[in-house]
Amino acid sequence: MSEKIRTMQGRVISDKMDKSIVVAIERMVKHPIYGKYIKRTTKLHAHDENNECGLGDTVEIRECRPLSKTKSWTLVNIVEKAKA
């Protein structure tokens, strides 16, 4: 059986922890009554083994086994570095 590995793309909003980052995933959802599309944000904690991510970087993460109480995602690659 091959399972589909979930991958997400988002922006790093915190890199202050050692070997960990917080990634904000933005999605658009339709309001059930008014029909207007609203921007919703999900924050995910991800494992960054080499501490290579910086604040504002666009990264790709994938789901993995639980690494801590809140961390179940790991960094795949950095799509775009933030402008310094």
Curated annotation (Swiss-Prot):
Q: Which GO terms describe its cellular component?
A: cytosolic small ribosomal subunit
InterPro entries, per database record: NA-bd_OB-fold, Ribosomal_uS17, Ribosomal_uS17_bact/chlr, Ribosomal_uS17_CS
- Positions of disulphide bridges: none
What are the recorded GO MF terms, alphabetically? rRNA binding; structural constituent of ribosome
Q: List the GO biological process terms.
A: translation
Which PROSITE patterns does this one have? RIBOSOMAL_S17
Keywords for the protein's UniProt record, in alphabetical order: Ribonucleoprotein, Ribosomal protein, RNA-binding, rRNA-binding
Annotated signal sequence range? none
Family per similarity comment? Belongs to the universal ribosomal protein uS17 family.
Q: What does this protein do?
A: One of the primary rRNA binding proteins, it binds specifically to the 5'-end of 16S ribosomal RNA.
Subunit structure comment from the entry: Part of the 30S ribosomal subunit.
Q: Per its record, how is this protein called by name? A: Small ribosomal subunit protein uS17
